């Protein structure tokens, strides 16, 4: 066997309580040219090691022994002799192997032990010796370096008294340089020179990164491309890592800035939209009576439009109203058409009438109402009644009209749109005045419109432009006014050039009705138990009426067979009549 290939004379101590395995291991180790000493007990082996200190290079011990655990023996050897110990056992459980390694075993062998494993145990001895040599050399070099540093510091203290400050700084730099040379010459304490990344050096680095590509960049490629003497791969790798962190931080800051600006714009836009929406909701009419709800949102919208037009009024004519409170009594036949508070005669809803097709729809909404006489413009007025569960005196409190010009003839051809709001108060039997109390100017106006009027009492059929509106039967009676026929059932057919009246029963005189006094020359129509309200500009809806009414020639389109009961309305029942126009 070649002596250079294998270390001869390695001193080995074998400890095992099994004599058979002890003999086998001794023979195998001697074949490897090792010097072998055997022992059957752990305590005996420990005594041998203490007596023959520094006479053994390595110890091989079994884990399971009767007098002492193998791990306990391992601890004693590691503390007292500091020798490499190899543990062996039949049981190869992982927990036991890990326990041996944790206690300081350099290897763990399983029985039966192979020859190859025993032949390589010298490596553990060699590693142990190398560590000892390095520790000794390290301690010696540290002592030498400490001596040099002390001498240099003493030299610096002397130079403080002998030279100026500038010379002292120069000397200190030279000494530091000498220290660096000494440390670099020492192989055990090698200290790398620190690289200062100047502006030019960093610019070369950035140019190399851009040339290679940020996705494909690597320290070796950058180092080769920069070609700077004294620059190592570790320096480039460290600087590349810092450069990547710097770029990621910049990108994060830009993203946060963009998101912050977008969030600010969104919040500003949302605030403005909320303000606009809130202002639109706050534009509700402030003069709506307490507890007087509306039937639909369209009515409330039209009320807002009419309230905005009231600001332009310059002169008003108040209408006197009787002071006495009256209640509207309902007949048994009309009980199904009234609400729980009082009877509601009906509501006629005027919407936009496509009379003048030349005007645009947007102009129609803001167009001032033309007067009934000769197309003279007049102001538009509308107010809402206060609902106090009593009789609403609409004429005296809420209605006012400009004085019309009676010089111009009044007729259906001169009507452009429905008239402004005219509120009329009509009572029932018991406390009333005859129509003869109305001023002659009103009577003349009604007479002039008599060819286009239609009166109904019990059953009414009004037909305008091929549209029929029917009413609910009522038991009230009506009377003519100054030559107008009093009819209980009549029909107006607009297909003929002149209206025709078809009486079906004998006319009867009105019992006890009352009409509130109107201003002079008021171009209005008496209406009993009916409420007309302008809530749109496109159609006319008949809701409900049960008493006699007189309508002038209205130039509009009427919806067919639209009839609603007052119970479907959200309005509380009122005892007056409303004419509304726009």
Curated annotation (Swiss-Prot):
Key words, A-Z: Activator, Cytokinin signaling pathway, DNA-binding, Nucleus, Phosphoprotein, Transcription, Transcription regulation, Two-component regulatory system
Location in the cell: Nucleus
Binding region for DNA: 189-248
Main subcellular location: nucleus
Pfam families reported for this sequence: Myb_DNA-binding (PF00249), Response_reg (PF00072)
Region spans: Disordered: 166-187
BP-aspect Gene Ontology terms: cytokinin-activated signaling pathway; phosphorelay signal transduction system
SMART domains: REC (SM00448)
UniProt keyword Transcription regulation present: yes
GO molecular function terms noted in the UniProt entry: DNA binding; DNA-binding transcription factor activity
Domain Response regulatory stretches: 11-126
Modification 4-aspartylphosphate, positions: 62
Highest taxon listed in the record's lineage: Eukaryota
Post-translational modification: Two-component system major event consists of a His-to-Asp phosphorelay between a sensor histidine kinase (HK) and a response regulator (RR). In plants, the His-to-Asp phosphorelay involves an additional intermediate named Histidine-containing phosphotransfer protein (HPt). This multistep phosphorelay consists of a His-Asp-His-Asp sequential transfer of a phosphate group between first a His and an Asp of the HK protein, followed by the transfer to a conserved His of the HPt protein and finally the transfer to an Asp in the receiver domain of the RR protein.
Biased composition (Basic and acidic residues): 166-182
Phenotype of gene-disrupted mutants: Dwarf, narrow leaf, low tillering, late heading and low fertility phenotypes.
NCBIfam families reported for this sequence: myb_SHAQKYF
Functional summary from the UniProt entry: Transcriptional activator that binds specific DNA sequence. Functions as a response regulator involved in His-to-Asp phosphorelay signal transduction system. Phosphorylation of the Asp residue in the receiver domain activates the ability of the protein to promote the transcription of target genes. May directly activate some type-A response regulators in response to cytokinins.
Family: Belongs to the ARR family. Type-B subfamily.
Name of this protein: Two-component response regulator ORR26
Organism: Oryza sativa subsp. japonica (Rice)
Phylogenetic lineage: Eukaryota, Viridiplantae, Streptophyta, Embryophyta, Tracheophyta
Record gene name: RR26
């Amino acid at each position: 066997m070649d002596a250079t290939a294998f270390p001869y004379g390695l001193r080995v101590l074998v400890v095992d309580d099994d004599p058979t395995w002890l003999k086998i291991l001794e023979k195998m180790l001697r074949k490897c040219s090792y010097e072998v000493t055997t022992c059957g007990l752990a305590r005996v082996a420990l005594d041998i090691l203490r007596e023959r200190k520094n006479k053994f290079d390595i110890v091989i011990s079994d884990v399971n022994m009767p007098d002492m655990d193998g791990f306990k023996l391992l601890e004693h050897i590691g503390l007292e002799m500091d020798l490499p110990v190899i543990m062996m056992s039949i049981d190869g459980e992982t927990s036991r192997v890990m326990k041996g390694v944790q206690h300081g075993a350099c290897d763990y062998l399983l029985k039966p032990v192979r020859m190859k494993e025993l032949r390589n145990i010298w490596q553990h001895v060699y590693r142990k010796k190398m560590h000892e040599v390095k520790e000794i050399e390290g301690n010696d070099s540290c002592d030498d370096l400490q001596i040099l540093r002390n001498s240099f510091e003493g030299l610096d203290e002397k130079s403080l008294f002998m030279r100026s400050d500038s010379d002292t700084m120069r000397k200190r730099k030279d000494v530091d340089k000498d220290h660096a040379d000494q440390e670099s010459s020492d192989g055990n304490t090698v200290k790398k020179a620190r690289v200062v990344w100047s502006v030019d050096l960093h610019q070369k680095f950035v140019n190399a990164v851009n040339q290679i590509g940020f996705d494909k960049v690597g320290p070796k490629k950058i180092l080769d491309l920069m070609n700077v003497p004294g620059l190592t791969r570790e320096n480039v790798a460290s600087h590349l890592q810092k450069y990547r962190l710097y770029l990621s931080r910049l990108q994060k800051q830009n993203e946060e800035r963009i998101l912050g600006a977008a969030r600010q714009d969104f919040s500003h836009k949302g605030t403005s939209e909320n303000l606009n929406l809130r202002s639109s909701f706050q534009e509700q009419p402030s003069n709506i009576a307490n507890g007087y709800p509306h039937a639909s949102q369209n009515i409330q919208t039209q009320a807002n439009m009419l309230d905005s037009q009231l600001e332009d009024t310059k002169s008003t004519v108040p209408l006197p109203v009787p002071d006495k409170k009256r209640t509207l009594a309902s007949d048994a036949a009309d009980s199904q058409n009234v609400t729980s508070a009082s009877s509601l005669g009906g509501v006629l809803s005027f919407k936009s009438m496509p009379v003048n097709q030349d005007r645009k729809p947007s102009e129609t909404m803001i167009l001032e109402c033309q007067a009934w006489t000769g197309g003279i413009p007049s102001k538009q007025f509308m107010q809402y009644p206060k609902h106090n569960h009593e009789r609403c005196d609409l004429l005296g409190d809420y209605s006012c009209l400009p004085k019309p010009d009676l010089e111009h003839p009044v007729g259906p051809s001169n009507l452009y749109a429905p008239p402004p709001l005219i509120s009329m108060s009509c009572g029932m039997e018991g406390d009333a005045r005859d129509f003869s109390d109305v001023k002659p100017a009103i009577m003349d106006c009604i007479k002039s419109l008599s060819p286009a009027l239609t009166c109904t009492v019990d059953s009414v059929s009004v037909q305008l432009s091929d549209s029929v509106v029917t009413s609910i039967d009522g038991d009230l009676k009506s009377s003519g006014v100054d030559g107008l026929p009093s009819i209980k059932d009549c029909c107006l057919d607009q297909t003929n050039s002149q209206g025709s009246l078809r009486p079906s029963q004998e006319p009867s005189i009105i019992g006890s009705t009352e009409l509130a006094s109107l201003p002079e020359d008021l171009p209005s129509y008496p209406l009993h138990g009916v409420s007309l309200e302008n809530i749109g500009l496109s159609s006319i809806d008949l809701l409900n009426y049960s008493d006699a009414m007189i309508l002038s020639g209205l130039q509009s389109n009427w919806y067919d067979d639209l009839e609603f009961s007052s119970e479907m309305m959200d309005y509380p029942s009122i005892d007056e009549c409303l004419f509304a126009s726009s």
